[in-house]
Amino acid sequence: MSNDNHVHGGDPRRELKRLGLETRDVLDFSVNVSPLGVPSEIKAIWKELLAEVDRYPSVDGQGVACYYQKRFNLDPARVLAGNGSTELIYLTPRALELRKVAVITPSFHDYTRSSLAAGADLLEVELKAEEGFAPLGFDILKEVMAEADGLFVGNPNNPTSTVFPRQLLLDLAASFPNKWILVDEAFVQFLDQPEEVSLIRQEPPPENILVFHSLTKFFALPGLRLGAVVGHPDTISRLRPLKEPWSVNRVAEKVALELIKCADYEKRLSSLVCLERPRVFNRIQDISGFQPFAPAANFLLARWTLTDQLDDLLRFMLGSGVHLRDCRNFPGLQDNFFRMAIRQPEENDRVLSLMRSCSDHYL
C-alpha cells in the first residue's frame, strides 16, 4: 500500500516548501504530544540506555506490557504490547478477519488504511460540523453495526476531539456480541476525567471490545513508539500469534518501565491541559475569522472563515514561525479546517496573538 496519502502533522519542512517559504525554525502546533517534553525520569537514564542496544529485546515487548499491568492493574493476559498503538490497529482487522468495517469520519486515517489492507469493505459514518461534531447516538450506531462486523471509534476522536460516552460503547457491544468495537484511546489521558471515559480497566472486560492505548503522545516520546491493545484474554489470545516478533525495541521496553515512576509528570500535564484548553478555546472564539469547536482533549479543531483559502492562514502563521495542522485531507474537512495542539501558556499566547494579527490583516 502506498504511503503517498499518509499525511500527518509534524513535518513543517514539507509545509514550508509547499507554501514557498524559506526554511526556518518553527513552533510545531501540528502534533498533539505533551508540551512538557520528555519526562525528567527518562532524561536521567538516557545515557544508560546506550548499554541496552547490543542486546535483544523480548520477543513480545514485555517491558511495555509490564507498564500497563502495573499502571492500570491489568492481568498480563489482557495486554499485547506493540511498536506504538498503530501497529496493533493494523494487526486487528487482519487477525479478526473483518469483512466490513465502519469508520467514523473525520478520524485518524489509519483506521481506514488498516481495514483496507486487511481486505475489508468500508462503511463511513459522518460526524457533522453543523452539529459541532457531536458523538453519534445509540440508535444511529445500532444501524451502523447491523451492516458492519466491526466499528473503529477514536475516543477522544482525532481531529474533532469528540468523546463517546463509555456506557454507550458498552451498550453497543452488549447489543452486538458477535461484532467488534475497536476503541482508540490514544488521547484519553488528556481528558479532564479519563477514568470516566476509558474502557481500559473495564471489569469484566467484554470479549468484543478492544482498546488501543498509546504512551508516546502523553509522555512526548513519539520517536520511540510505545503502545498496547487491551482486551479480554480470549480476544488477545487471537491476536498474539499473528503479531510479528521483536517489534518493540529494547530501549522502548526500558523506557516504559521507567514511565511507571512518572506520577508527578502525569499530574502536572493533566493540570496544564485542563487549564489551558478552555482558555485557548474561549480566546479563539473572540477572534474574527475563526470558528473553533469545543475541545475535550489536548487539541482543538477550527475553521478559517475570512478567506476562501486556508493557505492564507497557514502561510501567515508558518511565515511567523508557527506550524498548524492542515486538516483538508480528512474526509468532511475540506472547507478550511485546521487543528492546533494545546501547549504551554506562553506558546499558546504566541499563537493567539498571531491569529489576531492574521485576522486584522484580512479584515
Predicted regions and their residues:
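N-terminal "arm"/small-domain region of PLP-dependent enzymes with the aminotransferase-like
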Residues: 1-55, 146-149
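Conserved small-domain helix->loop->beta segment predominantly found in fold-type I
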Residues: 281-306, 326-335, 363
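PLP-dependent enzyme catalytic core of the Aspartate aminotransferase-like
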Residues: 167, 319-320, 331-363
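Conserved PLP-anchoring active-site segment centered on the Schiff-base-forming lysine
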Residues: 95-116
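Conserved PLP-binding catalytic core of the aspartate aminotransferase-like
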Residues: 273-274, 287-320, 342
